[in-house]
Amino acid sequence: MGSQSSKAPRGDVTAEEAAGASPAKANGQENGHVKSNGDLTPKGEGESPPVNGADEAAGATGDAIEPAPPSQEAEAKGEVAPKETPKKKKKFSFKKPFKLSGLSFKRNRKEGGGDSSASSPTEEEQEQGEISACSDEGTAQEGKAAATPESQEPQAKGAEASAVSKGGDAEEEAGPQAAEPSTPSGPESGPASASAENE
């Protein structure tokens, strides 16, 4: 603005510039753009029509338009809507059995089990499974373990390998602790069973 007035001689102000400058500033518009700093009144100071009628319509509606915040709220609601319908969490499944700090996590195949406890058993569930497994196949191992209590670890590993080859869940859980309840007496059974648990 200053550069235009400095180039033109001071006395030669055209009628377009004079008419265009005063109504534009009265409506809060400059160079065809609406100034919106919050200090404007809904109607301009001057009631004179601007050079371009579309500019005033945009300026008048720009001041009067208040539904813009609801559209922003609608956008916010649109963003919230996907969060209201949470995605189903993918169930984690073990593909291979593994041991972590003495606990063995193995794949369970329970019929009709859709709960999370089937995929990650706790210590109590493992103990219950091992006790039931011991009652099934523990009688066969009792005779061997009672005869040679020093060979409990190799038997436990052998039982674990045979259980994996058979693919039975109860047999898999029998693992290294299967020989522990089978030999309740004897001084050698205490340390041997403790070492089997620590592995």
UniProtKB/Swiss-Prot annotation:
Phosphothreonine modification, residue list: 14, 85, 148, 183
Low complexity compositional bias, start-end: 16-26, 53-64, 175-199
Basic and acidic residues compositional bias, start-end: 74-85
Membrane topology of the entry: Lipid-anchor
Gene Ontology, cellular component aspect: cytoplasm; cytoskeleton; plasma membrane; presynaptic cytosol; presynaptic membrane; synaptic vesicle
Region annotation (Disordered) ranges: 1-199
Family: Belongs to the MARCKS family.
The name this protein goes by in its record: MARCKS-related protein
Organism: Rattus norvegicus (Rat)
